[in-house]
């Protein structure tokens, strides 16, 4: 497996593991290995991953973000997604913005739980309370700049080109 870079084909590193004190995971196939190498590559500022449901797109991205946060590469993780329901909408949700976003980030929470070594979401909640992880609705992206941030845009296939451009142009240093 190789990647074309600067006029040559470089061999993909076979390091399938992604471990820190808090999370652990590994690539299960060549596609995941390729995605993991792109996510871990500091020379690649934007990675877009496509695949079937359950292929590990969100899982690998989230684990990489947490490992990079703990390695000091980033100051925080921002997770966003479009709030477009699959079926009929259930209407307005009670609570503050975090409460309203919880049903939409349930897949991310599932992936976080899967990647945590102790399988307890307390760690996620502590990180969220400290501001290390932020849940940001796509509707409120305008005017923001994300410096020193690992930005995850989950389920981006539900977004328009305008929404995608809005998010991409928010990425700072």
Where are these regions (language model features)?
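Interdomain "pre-motor" coupling segment immediately N-terminal to P-loop NTPase/helicase cores
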Residues: 1-16
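N-terminal pre-P-loop "Q-motif" helix
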Residues: 24-43
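Conserved catalytic network of the ASCE P-loop NTPase/AAA+ motor domain
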Residues: 41-42, 70-72, 142-145, 159, ...
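Walker A (P-loop) ATP-phosphate-binding motif of ABC ATPase nucleotide-binding domains
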Residues: 46
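Hydrophobic anchor at the beta1->P-loop junction of P-loop NTPases
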Residues: 49-51
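Walker A (P-loop) phosphate-binding loop of P-loop NTPases
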Residues: 54
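Conserved P-loop
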Residues: 59-127
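Conserved RecA-like ASCE ATPase "motif II neighborhood" in helicase/translocase motors
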Residues: 131-166
């Amino acid at each position: 497996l190789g990647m074309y870079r600067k006029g040559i084909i470089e061999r993909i590193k076979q390091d399938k593991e992604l471990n820190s004190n808090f999370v652990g995971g590994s690539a299960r196939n060549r596609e995941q290995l390729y995605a993991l190498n792109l996510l871990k590559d500091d020379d690649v500022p934007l990675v877009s991953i496509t695949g079937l449901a359950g292929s590990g797109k969100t899982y690998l991205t989230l684990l990489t973000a947490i490992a990079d946060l703990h390695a000091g590469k980033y100051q925080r993780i921002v997770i966003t997604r479009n709030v477009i329901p699959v079926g009929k909408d259930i209407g307005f949700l009670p609570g503050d913005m975090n409460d309203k976003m919880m049903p939409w980030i349930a897949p991310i929470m599932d992936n976080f739980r899967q990647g945590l070594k102790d399988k307890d979401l307390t760690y996620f909640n502590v990180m969220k309370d400290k501001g290390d992880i932020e849940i940001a609705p796509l509707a409120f992206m305008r005017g923001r700049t994300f410096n020193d941030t690992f930005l995850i845009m989950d389920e981006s296939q539900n977004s328009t080109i305008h929404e995608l451009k809005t998010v991409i142009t928010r990425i700072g240093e």
